[in-house]
């Protein structure tokens, strides 16, 4: 397997968030809601079920304070996730607030695309610099079978509109599944041949609620990787703030392929991201502990020093790697609550 070079950045990018294994954290994944309106068969096949007690998601002011603390400690990139973040009525205000935080250079959005065609112009105006949208199939019927929603054509129009208004690249996510996604690989490759899309195939991950689905549908991304390498695709360098994807390009394609393979050896070695849930808990790993509560330090601006101290101290408890390879997904029953 080819190794991926890491693209080094300047000294002004040095983060104060460094763990025991000398990994540097410049990337925050911020969930703003647990609610999702899709019923994806690999995540929430029965749809979102609200808890019996009313949950209060992070407010604008709380979001502002947590992002400011991370930025002060060297974070440069924030990804707004959910659930489906655009379902929040104040989503545009959230995006604007994050984008206006001193030190934040990229504000990315992960979305199911439900409102993309309608709102993409507003997202851009609010400060969203990068977009990841889920498209698990390019077949209308299959897309509805996977997601429970007949929205494929609208999402594809939203992607086209993003290019029209100046987005230079859109990342498209598809969960790699034996029955659904894998047979469409050629169709996805044809789609990105003349479009600046990074088509990202994400290995299905085992979670508490989806064990049987995982056993039936899991497919290693290595099989896709080997095929692409044989067809002339080449691995690209990674920047410090990039996500976990191994990215491949081909001289005959305008688009790229990204492979996210959490079961691969050393997957965690280049981890650069921390997660804050919509309820204000810091999660050191997607497949980890119950989270470290930050909310008691988000009510006043005067608590910033305490908040930053808690973040730095908590990071020292981050494990070297997850334990997915032995079937341990931690407390994660599904990925909707923390945005994957």
UniProtKB/Swiss-Prot annotation:
One of its GO terms (molecular function) is GTP binding. SUPFAM superfamilies: Radical SAM enzymes. GTP binds at residues 29, 79, 110, 171, 273-275. Pathway: Cofactor biosynthesis; molybdopterin biosynthesis. Monomer and homodimer. [4Fe-4S] cluster 1 binds at residues 36, 40, 43. Keywords: 4Fe-4S, GTP-binding, Iron, Iron-sulfur, Lyase, Metal-binding, Molybdenum cofactor biosynthesis, Nucleotide-binding, S-adenosyl-L-methionine. Its EC number is 4.1.99.22. It is an enzyme of class 4 (lyase). PANTHER family: GTP 3',8-CYCLASE, MOLYBDOPTERIN COFACTOR SYNTHESIS PROTEIN A. Binds 2 [4Fe-4S] clusters. Binds 1 [4Fe-4S] cluster coordinated with 3 cysteines and an exchangeable S-adenosyl-L-methionine and 1 [4Fe-4S] cluster coordinated with 3 cysteines and the GTP-derived substrate. SMART domains: Elp3. S-adenosyl-L-methionine binds at residues 42, 83, 134, 205. The keyword 4Fe-4S applies. InterPro entries: Aldolase_TIM (IPR013785), Elp3/MiaA/NifB-like_rSAM (IPR006638), MoaA (IPR013483), MoaA_NifB_PqqE_Fe-S-bd_CS (IPR000385), MoaA_twitch (IPR010505), MoCo_biosynth_MoaA/MoaC (IPR050105), rSAM (IPR007197). It catalyses: GTP + AH2 + S-adenosyl-L-methionine = (8S)-3',8-cyclo-7,8-dihydroguanosine 5'-triphosphate + 5'-deoxyadenosine + L-methionine + A + H(+). Residues 20-246 form the Radical SAM core domain. It comes from the Bacteria. One of its GO terms (biological process) is Mo-molybdopterin cofactor biosynthetic process. Catalyzes the cyclization of GTP to (8S)-3',8-cyclo-7,8-dihydroguanosine 5'-triphosphate. This is GTP 3',8-cyclase. Its cofactor is [4Fe-4S] cluster. Belongs to the radical SAM superfamily. MoaA family. [4Fe-4S] cluster 2 binds at residues 268, 271, 285.
């Amino acid at each position: 397997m080819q190794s991926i070079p890491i693209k080094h950045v300047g000294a002004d990018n040095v983060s104060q968030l460094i763990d025991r294994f000398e990994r540097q954290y410049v990337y925050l994944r911020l969930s703003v809601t647990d609610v999702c309106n899709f019923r994806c068969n690999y995540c929430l096949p029965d749809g979102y079920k609200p808890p019996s007690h009313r949950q209060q998601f992070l407010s604008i002011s709380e979001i502002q304070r947590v992002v400011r603390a991370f930025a002060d400690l060297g974070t440069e990139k924030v990804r707004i996730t959910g659930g489906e973040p655009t379902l929040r009525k104040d989503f545009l205000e959230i995006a604007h607030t994050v984008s206006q935080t001193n030190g934040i250079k990229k504000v990315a959005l992960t979305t199911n695309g439900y409102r993309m065609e309608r709102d993409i112009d507003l997202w851009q105006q609010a400060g969203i610099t990068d977009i990841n949208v889920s498209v698990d199939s390019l077949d209308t019927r299959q897309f509805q079978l996977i997601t429970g929603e007949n929205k494929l054509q609208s999402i594809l129009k939203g992607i086209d509109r993003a290019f029209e208004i100046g987005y230079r690249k859109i990342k498209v996510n598809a969960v790699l599944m034996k029955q659904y996604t894998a047979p469409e690989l050629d169709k996805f490759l044809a789609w990105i041949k003349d479009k600046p899309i990074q088509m990202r195939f994400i290995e299905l991950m085992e979670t508490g609620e989806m064990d049987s689905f995982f056993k039936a549908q899991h497919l290693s991304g290595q099989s896709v990787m080997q095929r692409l390498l044989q067809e002339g695709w080449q691995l690209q360098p990674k920047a410090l703030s990039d996500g976990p994807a191994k990215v491949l390009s081909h001289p005959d394609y305008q688009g790229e392929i990204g492979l996210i393979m959490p079961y691969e050896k050393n997957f965690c070695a280049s981890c650069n991201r921390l997660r804050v849930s919509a309820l204000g808990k810091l999660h050191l790993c997607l497949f980890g502990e119950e989270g470290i509560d930050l909310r008691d330090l988000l009510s006043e601006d005067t608590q910033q020093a305490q908040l930053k101290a808690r973040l730095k101290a908590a990071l020292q408890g981050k494990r070297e790697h997850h334990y997915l390879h032995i079937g341990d997904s931690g407390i994660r029953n599904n990925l909707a609550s923390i945005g994957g």
